[in-house]
Amino acid sequence: MNRGGLPSVQDNQPPSRQQSLSLFLLLSFFSFRLVLTPTMACKHTILQLNSSPFAELAGYEQPDAAARAAAETTSGRAPKSVKDRPIGTFPAPLVLPHDELNYDPDSSPQSAKEWLNEECRNKLSSAPRMNKLYVVQVPGISFKADFMRHWVVPSGYDEVKSEGKVGPSPPSADHFVDYLTAFYHDMPVRLFPTPLTWTSWGSNTKSAKGCRSAALPKYIGLSHGDHCTRIRVRPAPDTAFPAQLNLDDILDATISILPDDAYAMVLLVDHDIYESEDDDFCCGRAYGGSRVAVVQTARYNPILDERKGEEIDRSHMWPWSHCKTFVGELCAVEDVKATPATKKEKELSKGGAMKAATQAATAYKPTSSVQEVQALWFSRLARTVSHELGHCFALDHCVYYACNMQGTGSMKEDVRQPPYLCPVCEAKVAHAIAGELHGGREEEKRDWIKQRCEALRHFCKRLGDKDMDSSMWQGLNGWLQERMVAM
């Protein structure tokens, strides 16, 4: 699906969510182009904490403080004295031109009470079964399907592969296990124990090294043990990659191998994927009721940030995306005049968790261009992996705040969204894990939220030891530290 000339990202909840460095990421020759630390010409002095001026034109209105407070409770009733969450910690969705809420501003909010009563929700239980999260590492490639290695290389960059210039390998599945262990605190997270493998399907063993559709096999196989699932293949409509694999077929394979003790499982795929014939591509999708998700890595390749017409402003990824000057410039494209900073906006921009996040992100210095590319790739993927698993917890797209569970209309919007959960979505996960899985009551849920923040901070701090630190993780760590002061 195409929206406003931007590729769509699919998800398991309507509206769709749009969303790797390839195995042969060029770095030797192109390393000077991949230094991602932005030159901070913009100081991000004033923060955009309310929705943008464009939001009104789009028809989006953030639910008021009472509605947001009520949405956090499983009873659906707001506390007698409503204390609004500080906007400097939990800002509103930006709602910029071509964002998801631009196209679906009336998207129905899902309160904690509505989430609790979702028919498709799989309730967690303290019984020792169906209580684990699984991460399936990227499938290997058999000799018969060796031609598929070429498909993970962005079109136009194979000459670097032929010169033997190999960049960072894909992020290890272990990194995602560590992250999800913190993000879904107190849930056991495991690597799927047996590997999956891409292989040829039937007698179709074409070399398929070109981008021409005639050179592509119609199907390939995804094997696990003695079982093999047929996966459809097509050329990428935008030619970003030589080939795409069908998401629905991959999800069917994932469902068939779901362990008995799994609450949910996510499969990582290095190849570009699509869902329907109308899609340009699809980055992530979850079948929440079936408890499985698939996330591709290819479209998060930072090389694609420079594609004509789809350039990503690396100096305004989250948390810098809340820069008022940046927001004003994007609104001006739609003839929406930016408003001057008010006294209140100036005051709010001097402190708070979002200010701490922007300062921490700006202070980050990568150790090398290789490390920076690898870490950026992982940070982008981590957001989508946690988002898609959120749908397996029956969380719908969030419209209450800027939140990791927001829907996404483009890759540009994807990198502008936060890695944290808003109070409403966090309350749902707290009820599922601290309440249902561990039998806790309201006090235990509040304690769990604090412990989760600590776990995420610990994760962020340890990334430096693994050469996986980035501006997003530093920003999240700064945000968490400031948030916890008020807890």
Predicted regions and their residues:
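Low-complexity, intrinsically disordered or signal/transmembrane-proximal segments
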Residues: 10-13, 18-19
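Active-site-proximal segment of zinc-dependent metalloprotease catalytic domains
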Residues: 235, 239, 247-386, 392
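Hydrophobic alpha-helical signal peptides and transmembrane signal-/tail-anchor segments
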Residues: 22-33
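N-terminal low-structure segments adjacent to metalloprotease catalytic domains
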Residues: 34-282, 436-487
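Short coil/turn segments at secondary-structure boundaries
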Residues: 146-151, 278-281, 306-311, 397, ...
